[in-house]
Amino acid sequence: LSAAEARAAGAAVAGRVPVLTLTNDSAVRNSGTFVFGITPGQAASAILGYARSRGVRRVLAVDDGTPWGRASVAAAKMAEAELSLSIDIATLTGGALPVLATPPDALFVPGGSALVLAAARQAKDSGVQLLATVQALDYRPDALAALDGVWIASPDPDRFATFAQSYTARNGGRPGAIAALGYDAASIARTLRDADTLTREGLLGESGFDCVTGQVRFRSDGSCARDFAILVPRSGVYEKVAESRGA
């Protein structure tokens, strides 16, 4: 469901059953409507938490003006104290990345592939570690070469590959993130139905759910914690170097 549809569906069922929405707009969440989309906050927390574990202290977060970019940078700033990071924010001006007069430990560029590629080329010789999100994934050989060494938070590609093979064999074409989320949502509903726990309490079970888009555990406020893989492009492939639990 979209954000608008989620609100309407939540009102229509009036709490009789939980509503899973595929939106990544955290504003629609409440005690009966659960945001199941991959959110900017989840991705930002995952990559920044990993960066902190690797010794990063000072981060410059780049707001590119897109909804995802703005929300990611805002989420990063909100997590600053919790992660013991110092996070400054730079707003993209005229499409140009900020000049790193005093380089931070890391540059967080949550936006799409083109911007991350530009940042990677700019930061390559500066000693600054580049941090990115699933939005940066790009499988073109020249892009993989440019992204070499970048830390990226993404749903686990191995999980997705297994789903994608099955999807393609049955339906043709290659599935996207929405198809994977839809499959996961249907699988969760089926699991709850089979256990006769198709209720809010069932959805909030401590064990969570093993999904194509990562292990998830739902919270009572309508959000969910999602596991992420940390990927690093090396020698033309994305290498999984760590897992982030429950971002």
Language-model features: where?
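Sec/Tat-exported extracytoplasmic proteins
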Residues: 51-55, 63, 76-84, 111, ...
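Solvent-exposed, polar/charged alpha-helical surfaces in well-ordered, non-transmembrane soluble domains
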Residues: 7, 11, 45-49, 53, ...
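Segments of small-molecule ligand-sensing domains
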Residues: 170-242
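Extracellular/periplasmic periplasmic-binding protein-like sensory domains
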Residues: 33, 114-183, 194-197
